[in-house]
């Protein structure tokens, strides 16, 4: 009897062994089958059926195993804990010692020019100093005289961020990824460029800084050639790579990214200063989700005094990026839904667009979503294009308020465009054609140069970008407006009339004048056919809009012509009578509220009693 049991035991062992070998063979075939199934959808159902068979077989093996006598041949294995599933990093949080900066800042002179981020001040100027200051403004469009006298390694004073930012801790698992900092420059002032570099070295944890890559976009200033190369050798992790031909920001950043070795790319402009703890919150968010593109809270370094606008602990009004229908980037306060979502300043801000100058992104994700459009030239539009692409293709744009970086905002660019400023319109046409679907017509009505390029197909080949959109299975632009930026007012896709409003009595066009965001009087000006200040739309809601950037409406309150923010903003709103206009068959424009008509008097637009026989009340969209 005992012998029979032993024979049965041997048979069972053979059966278990055979079943296990067969199981391993099928499992190996299953792996290759799954790889094919991801590429061939018709195989997915077969793989699913195979999964069911494997489950049954595995169950049979387990049943045979469990029916066998149990032999205690080793000590019980300890229960695996959650922490042991990831042996590559330690539990808990990074300590301040672990996050020590790459370089400690040298002792500071509290009375030095611009110390602790304070403004540079000077009361008396010699003729030579005045000349130097003026030349600095002319060359760099900021006060290079002041910058040159402020320490390259100046401190920015105590950490004034909100307490929850100062006290924020960062988990070791998943570990914070290291970053390559990429800084593009073209004829940048020596002091602002090097202060940016030192700022990174003095505020970035050594374990997180892989390298700083300075990308020279064909600078012509001699001090940025061999002297710069010689200087940065002492900075250990800093290298210079160069474009021999001026190609602009986009290709320069692509060059920097191509040589970067870290997991994360961090792009900065060449006139920045980083505040306490600026990098860790950016990297922590990417460690959580590599499809998030993160920007710091960008504060102002005054272009005249180089005063650093420090963060405040309470009461800051946060902003996010937006765009208008001329595809210009801008800022706006957070909508109520975003304010309610955030519990404190450690919460990211969801942003429809980003400024594009300062941000961090996973290198692998940067490559996955198509880096930059390398057929865009110099700069202009690349940030809006990337904003649309990230959101529409499954990623997110966020601003991290606890990360603070200062930036010198200039009122104009000191650099020329080798191919003229037409490159901006060309870049914008490329992004409109790839990402905006039918909504691109709203943009083309506001930019006649871009519309002409689109008609003439003079914006280059976009086939690769269209293939990228298809390959990534990206959402359409309607989805972006509905889900990412529902606050965006969408003008009529096909307004009743649009263009310039020409007065037939004086042969001039209605014009809003310079920098008129409402409240300033309108004017009549020679018709120039360029849109801009002379662009108007008569909508299906019967309001008359100047909406290149903001949605501004003509109104005739108390018989006076004016311009103000439109009352009709979509759902749950309507056009008030003083913003409602009627275009008559006699070419009059009558206001529904006052009953008066738009007329020209002394070459100024005013409201007057309607008179169909007066040519100064005859208007035509051209």
UniProtKB/Swiss-Prot annotation:
Cofactors: Mn(2+)
UniProt-listed SUPFAM superfamilies: Nucleotide-diphospho-sugar transferases, Ricin B-like lectins
Enzyme nomenclature, EC number: 2.4.1.41
Residues annotated to bind Mn(2+): 269, 271, 407
Residues bearing attached sugar chains per UniProt: 86, 476
GO cellular component, one term: Golgi membrane
Record's comment describing the protein's domains: There are two conserved domains in the glycosyltransferase region: the N-terminal domain (domain A, also called GT1 motif), which is probably involved in manganese coordination and substrate binding and the C-terminal domain (domain B, also called Gal/GalNAc-T motif), which is probably involved in catalytic reaction and UDP-Gal binding.
Region feature (Catalytic subdomain B): 348-410
Residue span of region Disordered: 103-135
Residue intervals annotated with topology Cytoplasmic: 1-8
Keyword Signal: no
Protein name: Polypeptide N-acetylgalactosaminyltransferase 6
PANTHER family the record matches: N-ACETYLGALACTOSAMINYLTRANSFERASE, POLYPEPTIDE N-ACETYLGALACTOSAMINYLTRANSFERASE 6
Organism name: Bos taurus
Membrane topology, Lumenal segments: 29-622
Family: Belongs to the glycosyltransferase 2 family. GalNAc-T subfamily.
Binding residues for UDP-N-acetyl-alpha-D-galactosamine: 511, 514, 528, 533
One of the record's GO molecular function terms: polypeptide N-acetylgalactosaminyltransferase activity
Pfam hit, one: Ricin_B_lectin
EC class of the enzyme, as a word: transferase
Reactions catalysed, as given in the entry: L-seryl-[protein] + UDP-N-acetyl-alpha-D-galactosamine = a 3-O-[N-acetyl-alpha-D-galactosaminyl]-L-seryl-[protein] + UDP + H(+); L-threonyl-[protein] + UDP-N-acetyl-alpha-D-galactosamine = a 3-O-[N-acetyl-alpha-D-galactosaminyl]-L-threonyl-[protein] + UDP + H(+)
Compartment list: Golgi apparatus membrane
Composition skew (Basic and acidic residues), residue ranges: 119-135
GO biological process: protein O-linked glycosylation; protein O-linked glycosylation via threonine
